[in-house]
Structure formats: C-alpha cells, structure tokens
Amino acid sequence: MGRGIGSKRRVEDDDGENMPGRKKKEEEEEEEDDDGEEEYEVDVVRDRIGSSRGSRLALFGSDLRLGRFRPRRRRVAPVDGDDGIFQDFVIDPDNKWYRLWTRFILVWAVYSSFFTPLEFGFFRGLPRNLFFLDIAGQIAFLIDIVLRFFVAYRDPDTYRMVHNPTSIALRYCKSSFIFDLLGCFPWDAIYKACGSKEEVRYLLWIRLTRAMKVTEFFRSMEKDIRINYLFTRIVKLIVVELYCTHTAACIFYYLATTLPESMEGYTWIGSLQLGDYSYSHFREIDLTKRYMTSLYFAIVTMATVGYGDIHAVNVREMIFIMIYVSFDMILGAYLIGNMTALIVKGSRTERFRDKMKEVIRYMNRNKLGKDIREQIKGHLRLQYESSYTEASVLQDIPVSIRAKISQTLYKPYIESIPLFKGCSAEFIQQIVIRLQEEFFLPGEVILEQGSAVDQLYFVCHGALEGVGIGEDGQEETILMLEPESSFGEIAVLCNIPQPFTVRVCELCRLLRLDKQSFTNILEIFFVDGRRILSNLSESSEYGSRIKQLESDITFHIGKQEAELTLRVNNAAFYGDMHQLKSLIRAGADPKNTDYDGRSPLHLAACKGFEDVVQFLLHEGVDIDLSDKFGNTPLLEAVKQGHDRVATLLFSKGAKLSLENAGSHLCTAVARGDTDFVRRALAYGGDPNARDYDHRAPLHIAAAEGLYLMAKLLVDAGASVFATDRWGTTPLDEGRRCGSRTMVQLLEAAKSGELSRYPERGEEVRDKMHPRRCSVFPHHPWDGGERRREGVVVWIPHTIEGLVSSAQEKLGLAGSGEGLRLLGEDGARVLDVDMVHDGQKLYLVVGGGGDDGGTEARQ
C-alpha cells in the first residue's frame, strides 16, 4: 500500500481559511480500562491525493483489465522533519518549526490583546522600557505577516492543500493582511509626531484583531479530546469575563483623563473618596492602584452590585455605564448559557468529543490500522465542521415534504447526469426522493475494483479518479469523474464486479442511491431502464473500456426485454387490463413475442378475454402473427372455443392460417370434435384440405360412419368426388362402412354437386376408369411393308396432350407441329372426347393419302 496520511493533527479553523493541525504521536496500545484509556486528538486528514497507490488493488490485477494508461502524478509537500520547512518557498502548516512559531506568536497575541486597552487608557506615550518591548512585539508580528505569505492552506471547497504562492498571497491579502499590517504600526511614536492628536490613539484598537489568535487557540483546545472539556470551557469563560472587565476598566479610566486637571472633580475617580483616602490629583497616584480601582469599578458595575461607593459623575460616564451594563446583560446570558450547556452536556462540540472517544475506544479495542483510523477520524471531523449531517433534523418531517425538499435540492443535479439523458420526469422524480447525501475526503477509496457494488453514486461537487490495475500490476488512471458524473452504474446494471477503483481527489459531495431502490424503480419504468442502458453503451466517458462490457450490456438489454415481454404476456393471459395498460403506458411494446413466438394477443385469444383482445388490436398488435407452432390468435380462439373472440378477430380480417390444415381437420374428425371442425370451417377452414394420404376430412367421416360430421362437411362445401392416393372417394368409403344413411347423404351430395358442377363427373370417371388407346406411326391405309410398331397410351384431357404423349412414346423427332391423329377410317381426330377406350389411332404428318400422304418418320 502506498504512503497514507503522514500524521495526526488537531482541528483549527483559522477564520475559515486554513485549518493547521498538530502532529501527535499515535498510541498503538489498547488500554485496559476506560478510565486509563488514551485520548487522541481530533485529526485533520492530510491531502492524500496520490496516496494508497500500488498494492491496495493488486489482488484484482488478473480480473477485469481495462487497458493501460499513464498514471497521473501529484506533488505532495513534505509533512515532517526539517526538510519540509520550504517546498518551492511554501511552508507546510504542519511543520514542527512553524507550529513552534505559531505558539510564540500566540504569546505575543495574548500580550498585545491585554496591553492595547491598557496603553490606550493609562498611557499617553509609553515609557522607555515598555516602548522597546512594544517594538519587539511589532517586529515579531511583522515577521509573522511575511511568513503567512508562504504558508500553504487547505482549500475549504476541495479540501486540497494549496501550495501555489500566488494563491496563498492573494488569499491572505483578501483576509486579514490589512489589519495585521496596520496593527504593526508604531502608533505611540506616530501619536507623538502628530502633536499628541487624540484621534491617532484610537487607531491602537486595530491591534485587538490579534485576539482572534487567542480565540482560535481556545477553539482548538475544545476540540482536543486529550484535554478535559469542562476545564477548557471554564477557563475560556473566565478569560472572556476578565478581558471584558479589563477593557471596561481601561475605558473608565480613559474617560476620566479626557477632562483637564482643573475639572478632575467632575470625574468618577477625581471625586472618589474611599474612607479617609481621596483620589484628587489621581494622575499622580501609583499606576497599580489606579488600575485596580478602575478594575474594581468595572467588576462591581458588571455584577450590578451597586454599592454606591463608585459611581458616574458626568454625562459621558453615565452613557458609557448604560452601554456597559447593557452589554453585561448579554455577556451574563452568554456565560450562564454556556455553564448550563456544560452541566447538561448538550453542546455540539461536546457531543462530537463524546462520539470521538467512543470511536477511539472501538479502534483501540479492534486494533485498526493507521490508514483506516485516519479515514474514520477525518469523517467525524468533517461531520462536525461542515455540519452536513444536519439533514437528520428532517427525519421528523412527513415523507411527502421531505420528498419535495429532495426535489428542490437534488433534481437539477440528476437531470444533468448523462446516464439519465432522455428519461421521463416521473422516473427522475423517483430517483431524486431516494437519494442520500454524503461527503468524502481526498484520498478515500469509495469503490474498489473487483468488489460487489450495491450503491450508485452521482457527483455534485469535487473530483474523483477511476483507477485500474495494468498488466504490470501498477495502478493506472482510467478516467476523471467531475460534477455531473456517475459511477457504479456498470456494476449495478450489468450485475458484474466493479471494473475499476474510484478514489477521491478533492473534497466531494456525492449523492448515493441504493441498488435495491434503483432496481425497484427500473421495474416500474421499463422504457427509462432501456434508455439508461442505451446511454451507458453510447457513453464516451469510459472511452474504449466500455467496449469490453458491450456484451454484458447487450445481454442485460435482451434480458430486460424478455422479462418485460413475459410480464405483458402474463397480464394478457390473466386478463389483467389495468396491469396491461400500466405496462404499455410505461413503455412496454405489446408487439414483442416471448420465447415461443407468442404475442399478448395469442394468450388473450386463448383465454377468451374479449376486452383485452380489443385493446391489443387497438394497440396495433399483428393479428395474423404465427407462433413457433404455427398458431395464429384466431386459431387459438377456435381451439379453445371462444366464439366471441374468434368472431371479433375474423371481423378484423384475421386468418386461420392452419399449417397442414388437412391433417388438423382429419384428426379433429377422427376424434369426433364437431365443435372445432364447425368453428374451423366457419372461420375460413378449407373442407377439402388433404392430409399426407390425400384424404379429405369427408373421407374420415364417411369411413367412420360419422353422419353428423359428414353432413357438417358437406354443408360446408366438402366434395364427394375427392379421391385419395388410392383413388377412393368418400362415397366409396361410405359404401365400405355399410352405413345406409351415410351413403344416402353422400349420394344426395353427389347429385347436388353434379348439378352445380357437371364436369366433376367426368373428372371422377376419368380418375376412377381411365381410358387408353393405341397409336401407330403410319397411315391407316399403308401396306404391310410401311406399317410400324405402335404404343398404348393413356388418354389425357386434351388432343394436344395426346399427340405430345404419343410422339414422346414413339420417339419421333421434331417439335410436333403438323402431326395429326387419324382414325381407322382415315378421318382426323380433333377432340379427345371422340376417342373411346381401346381405339386405334394413327399419327401422321399433314393430310396423308396414297397419292400424297406422308407417314411419320423416326
């Protein structure tokens, strides 16, 4: 594993600018009891971008390779040791020498904060010894100003350490540089040089901005869980009270010095008489006694004891005391409120400290590693400082209102995600109300390569990097994830291991969606699910890497289509009109078929749901679609006996489309299924369809003696002259059956058919008793020498056919033009109906005769 976080740091806010920490030695031993347990500092997680490279994901190096990329490198400033003082002339805030300097400046800040009101009230021109001390302090602050132009800081938005000198300088100039610089001016010398103008002395108060360093010190002590929180808070409150009274005492004395010596009696201290001691000519009294008297006046006034021994004399003093007492009421409320919070342990900081202690006990007990310790503490500190868990206050608000809040906060982000391009507003709304907001620090791994993923993430702010393992076993950066990006969707949608690691580069605000919730939404919004998979396959964000997953994506698209088709067919099968409409409204295509080629119309017709059939016809489902078994919706309705549905389909132009219709009808006749035969014939079935033996359904009915079936077939137009491959007609089958009624029915049908179609009698006769004739290739009057051997041929239906057949059998050459057939008397035969069975014919060319006829020659 690559280099992790270098050291632990104490949290400091530094005016919202940077948060320099304090590196402490980490305790590695587990404490035996709670009382003696080691308390750790709250740590600031370092800028860990580029850390944890190498072996963290080596176990998955053989899986899901995504190609080779050049890794992205980052420069990280040194953290510890003397070598880290300057890095490109930038000081790391965690350098131990710089931390010592900040403590040195803290001492001067305490001195300056207390001495500035004292100088303003009691001195008009510093004595020599205090003057040199003041100059030394200002020099120290000037050095600190110079150093702060080179101190790196942590960006509050990205949480990355900024080492750019220009950015550091601009940031400092925009913050406290002006006040720090003005505070270093020698205002005492300027006051004397300006002729002791009183207005100049007011500029001394600029130095009170240095009190912010003291405030930051107390704030860091409150967060340092090694120090008792109650003690820290009490010390802070005492210091606040003393500083307020100290400043008020200096102002009280200053008000008295603004009047000339001749009017000292009109001041609170000049008119003061304590016992036998008079404060007339108070400027000549010892400095300590004057300060203590002023401090006593300030404290008694703040406590509103009102002994009356010291009181205001002139109007200015009265006005200041009124302002001071009003301020004291606010200060008193602040002090009492803080003490109450200490007693009931209700402050946010104390809750954070308690939570941190519990976490540290857990980490010590389970002996967690250094890297995971840093991440846990960093997250706790982030929760405390950013207050991003404040959304928990909404838990008591109704779900509907929380949903509206989520839409207001997160909907713009989700709508801009490329993964959801083209999705419906209803789908986006369902996604938004199920989002959870999370923050991650730089360097943290959110998803690891090869792991099972059950969360989908969307980037609101910050930056992340996708890292894969190359063929050489080293980490390689695959892609950068910026705002409006998403990750985890490949593993979630394709149900495969995470193809690459996702690591935080900058402080990130992410929106998290649970896989189960996402799957549930996709089951309802089918079209949006297909759109998401399509967007994923077309995404350029992953470049060529997505090509390796195209088969998975295609498989899941097909799987989703098949599942959706089954759900539509299932709704049609059970006649669930509401569910069917909901599915189609959500984007399901009713024209799709299942694994057997069946559409919803097949199943609805099979079950006899007329309303479903009407709805599907309105949706444009193919009315004549055949499944893998050759069944159409109309045939399904006919088979199941749903006359109303069959009538509806037939009226819309549906066809029965019976494959091997003869076999179907013959089988139905054989089993006596009169209803099926009647419906099949009523909706377009052919009563004369033949099976593999050329038998018509009427053959089967006659052979089996099924009178009603035969009558049904005859009424539907079945021909009694149909012959099978053995030349048998239904009438022959009826005679063999021995059923008198059957024979009578078929004889009557024969008579009726002959009356309508007379030619059929001849056709049957020809088929039943075929005629033949003898054909000779010479003239009937030729002598014995010219006679030739003839052939016997069947008489076809046309004279041309007879000539052609005889020519072929006799082996005569030529096209057959000019050939004539003559009878025994030499007369030309023009029609096959003139030829009787067994007649002799002669095939000649031209008219023929003794004087001019010519016989056909081979």
Curated annotation (Swiss-Prot):
Membrane-protein topology: Multi-pass membrane protein
Domain of life (superkingdom): Eukaryota
Intramembrane stretch boundaries: 293-312
Subcellular localization: Membrane
Primary location group: membrane
Disulfide-bond pairs as recorded: none
Bias (Acidic residues) ranges: 27-41
UniProt GO cellular component terms: monoatomic ion channel complex
Record-linked Pfam families: Ank_2, cNMP_binding, Ion_trans, KHA
Residues that span the membrane, as ranges: 103-123, 131-151, 175-195, 202-222, 237-257, 317-337
Biological role: Probable outward-rectifying potassium channel.
Protein name (record): Potassium channel KOR1
Origin organism lineage: Eukaryota, Viridiplantae, Streptophyta, Embryophyta, Tracheophyta
